[in-house]
């Protein structure tokens, strides 16, 4: 970064920004104090010893005002500057710089955390779940970060505070809040692809941005409006475009000295040509040989293997209100409510793995079939908690008591063309996708009736952090309940699950700068009713997936605060894990009895301040994750590299100009029966900033590596993004 942020009384140096990019945890419920200016509003020269930010309060893992150093969990944060400097547009792209997390296949329904496949509804906005898309590929995607002040990645489960469904880890986006200082920014972002297989600067994704904040009357009423409009954004694959409008509008009312009310409205309107995700895959270089074991390089990376009439739409509206009230000096209340409505639909012609399509590895002519899906989802989410502190002699208690509720009403429809009917009607050439036939859409395909599903989640939780001298013991207790009801083929399946969960941790202060910690937390996730109906083959007595998470770590400041580091050893296990298996009658949902999965490893997040002009940040994860029973016993879990590392380097040339270099590596991964090769990629950036202007030029995948990002359908693969030249220009006034 070229300059410092001024926060509150201008006490924050470049070291604060550096450290926060690695180990700062963002609040899942927090509304900044009205006087807290989280945006850059002033620039000063960088000089002197970096100041540590490790004592800053953080609530993502605890929902309590606990410092980073005192939080006994492994987590990483990317703030707005980190996202901008790396040209990261959404959570999926942010995974590139967060070891231990990575995206799955093209439909974006799950992501990997600590080797465990995790539903995307574990992505939260301001502490509440935010699916922001329909079921089953109907336009759902990992959320944009256009309005993110911070994005936090919590490794491991946290069922005590967030309830059922938190698997390998959760993600929380803290949205930008209204500020007391009036400021408006308008900008333009453009991403162009420059590669031999996509053409040079022929495919461009341009968006226009607005960020305006300040007081409306006096400082007791503030506003913030953020918007991003992409009129016709090109994907790197020819034939795929997106038109997208993102809007986030918020107010802040300060009612006296003790109460703040923050209503917020968010809107997403997304239209895609070229499909919703089913047909993202391309073929790779070993396909023509007739045998695929380890994927080769993607071929025709810049081509789309779906049809010219594939479309996808997604509209999502969210209204929320956050209330914070200071009850007494040491007691406060926080209440957060959100209502979300989403409609979505998608039509795709895709290459299925169905054997009835009669496709063969090595055979150039490949059959495809139509799929249509639609969703109409409604969510109500609510969280309220009381936090306070009491002392009994030499023992200090930091207490939290809360209630979390989610009500889901989902109507989901999905219909596939019969595979036998599709044979010969929609062929495409594996070697040249321009040679294809788009057959008619089967009658009634888009008229498939929706299958309604309702689900309610209740979570009552209690936390107590008991401090005696330099030792803090953190204990938690929660009652978790989930009720599901689903209608399919005239049959209603209702199920109810509940459990009492507990967790325990200890944080030991070694000295002023260093703490060690040990933590135990729980995971609890009932099986979705939709999966039971569609893939259970008559089996209905599925047990909830349960798990344990153990962490042992150290975090603190070293070398006169020039090095901030967090090192965590972890062990995670699961009982009653589920997995999809291709049987003679199609896909079936299997459940492995007892302890069935484990993941062990180490995570390192560090930031080094070498000089006032040069600093680096590192994220590394070693993950050994596999089934402990069954045919895949001991086999590394899908899409999970044993080694993942990212390194980001900043060099400040002068007060206006800076440069950056990012390096990323992942070791070999599995994709079912196939292997995905290891890779190394590099990103570079150049930045210019004044009081009124900032310009950034970032080239992702600067060496234009052509590799497999993930598996898709059958033996097709999702290619990585080619060399992307990102230019952003912003004017501030």
Language-model features and meaning:
Residues 21, 38-181, 195-200, 552:
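Acidic, small-polar-rich N-terminal luminal/periplasmic segments of exported/outer-membrane proteins
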Residues 29, 375, 387, 398-399, ...:
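Conserved C-terminal beta-signal and adjacent last beta-strands/turns
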Residues 132, 138, 146-149, 160-247, ...:
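Outer-membrane beta-barrel translocator/receptor signature
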Residues 230-234, 242-243, 247-254, 258-326, ...:
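Acidic/polar loop-and-plug regions of large Gram-negative outer-membrane beta-barrel proteins
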Residues 252-256, 377, 394-408, 449-574, ...:
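Structural signature of Gram-negative outer-membrane beta-barrels, strongest in the C-terminal barrel
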Residues 271-285, 407-411, 483, 507-551, ...:
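Surface-exposed extracellular loop regions of Gram-negative outer-membrane beta-barrel proteins
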Residues 324-338, 342-348, 544-627, 695:
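Membrane-embedded beta-barrel scaffold of Gram-negative outer-membrane proteins
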Residues 470, 566, 571-573, 592-672, ...:
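Gram-negative outer-membrane beta-barrel transporters
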């Amino acid at each position: 970064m070229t300059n410092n942020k001024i926060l509150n009384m201008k006490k924050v140096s470049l070291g604060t920004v550096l450290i926060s990019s690695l180990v700062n945890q963002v609040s899942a419920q927090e509304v900044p104090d009205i006087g807290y200016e989280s945006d850059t509003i002033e620039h000063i020269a960088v000089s002197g010893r970096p100041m540590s930010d490790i004592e800053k309060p953080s609530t993502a893992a605890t929902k309590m005002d606990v410092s980073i150093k005192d939080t006994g969990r492994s987590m990483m944060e990317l703030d707005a500057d980190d996202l901008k400097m790396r040209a990261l547009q959404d959570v999926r792209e942010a995974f590139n710089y967060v070891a231990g997390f990575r995206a799955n296949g093209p439909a974006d329904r799950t992501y990997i955390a600590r080797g465990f496949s995790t539903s995307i509804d574990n992505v939260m906005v301001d502490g509440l779940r935010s699916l922001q898309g329909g079921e089953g590929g109907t336009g759902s995607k990992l959320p944009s970060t256009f309005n993110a002040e911070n994005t936090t990645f919590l490794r491991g489960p946290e069922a005590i505070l967030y309830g059922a469904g938190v698997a390998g880890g959760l993600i929380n986006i803290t949205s930008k809040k209204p500020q007391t200082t009036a400021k408006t920014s308008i900008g333009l972002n453009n991403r162009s692809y420059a590669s031999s297989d996509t053409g040079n600067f022929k495919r461009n994704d341009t968006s226009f941005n607005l960020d305006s904040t300040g007081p409306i009357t006096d400082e007791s009423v503030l506003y913030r409006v953020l918007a991003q409009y992409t009129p016709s954004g090109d994907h790197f694959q020819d034939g795929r475009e997106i038109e997208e409008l993102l809007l986030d509008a918020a107010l802040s009312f300060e009612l006296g000295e003790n109460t703040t009310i923050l209503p917020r409205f968010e809107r997403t309107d997304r239209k895609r040509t070229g499909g919703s995700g089913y047909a993202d895959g391309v073929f790779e270089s070993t396909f023509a040989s007739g045998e695929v074991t380890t994927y080769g390089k993607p071929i025709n990376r810049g081509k789309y293997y779906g049809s010219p009439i594939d479309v996808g739409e997604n509209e999502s509206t969210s209204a929320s209100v956050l209330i914070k009230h200071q009850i007494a000096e040491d007691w406060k209340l926080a209440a957060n409510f959100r209502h979300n409505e989403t409609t979505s639909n998608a039509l795709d012609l895709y290459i299925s793995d169905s054997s009835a399509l009669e496709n063969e590895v090595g055979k150039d002519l490949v059959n495809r079939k139509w799929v249509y899906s639609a969703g109409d989802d409604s969510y109500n989410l609510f969280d309220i908690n009381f936090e306070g502190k009491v002392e009994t002699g030499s023992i200090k208690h930091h207490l939290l008591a809360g209630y979390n509720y989610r009500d889901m009403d989902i109507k989901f429809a999905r219909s596939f063309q019969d595979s036998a009917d599709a044979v010969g009607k929609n062929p495409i050439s594996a070697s040249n996708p321009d040679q294809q036939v788009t057959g008619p859409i089967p009658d009634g395909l888009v008229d498939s009736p929706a299958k309604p599903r309702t689900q309610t989640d209740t979570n009552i939780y209690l936390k107590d952090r008991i401090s005696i001298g330099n030792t803090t013991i953190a204990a938690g207790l929660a009652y978790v309940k989930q009720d599901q009801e689903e209608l399919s083929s005239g049959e209603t399946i209702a199920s109810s699950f509940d459990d009492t969960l507990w967790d325990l941790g200890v944080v030991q202060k070694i000295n002023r700068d260093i703490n060690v910690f040990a933590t135990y937390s729980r995971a609890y996730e009932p099986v979705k009713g939709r999966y039971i109906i569609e893939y259970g083959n008559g089996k209905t007595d599925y047990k909830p997936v349960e798990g344990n998470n153990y962490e042992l770590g150290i975090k603190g400041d070293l070398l006169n605060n020039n090095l901030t580091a967090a090192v965590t050893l972890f062990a995670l296990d699961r009982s009653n894990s589920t997995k999809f298996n291709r049987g003679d009658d199609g896909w079936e949902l299997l459940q492995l009895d007892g302890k069935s999965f484990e993941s062990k490893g180490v995570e390192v997040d560090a930031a080094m301040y070498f000089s006032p002009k040069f600093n680096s940040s590192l994220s590394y994860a070693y993950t050994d994750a596999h089934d402990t029973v069954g045919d895949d016993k001991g086999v590394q879990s899908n899409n999970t590299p044993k080694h993942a590392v990212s390194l980001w380097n900043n060099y400040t040339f002068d007060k206006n100009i800076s440069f950056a270099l990012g390096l990323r590596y992942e070791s070999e991964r599995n994709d079912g029966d196939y292997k995905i090769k290891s890779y190394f990629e590099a990103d570079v950036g150049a930045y210019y900033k004044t009081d009124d202007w900032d310009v950034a030029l970032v080239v992702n995948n600067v060496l234009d590596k052509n590799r497999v990002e993930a598996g898709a359908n059958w033996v097709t693969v999702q290619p990585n993004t080619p060399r992307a030249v990102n230019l952003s220009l912003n004017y501030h006034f």
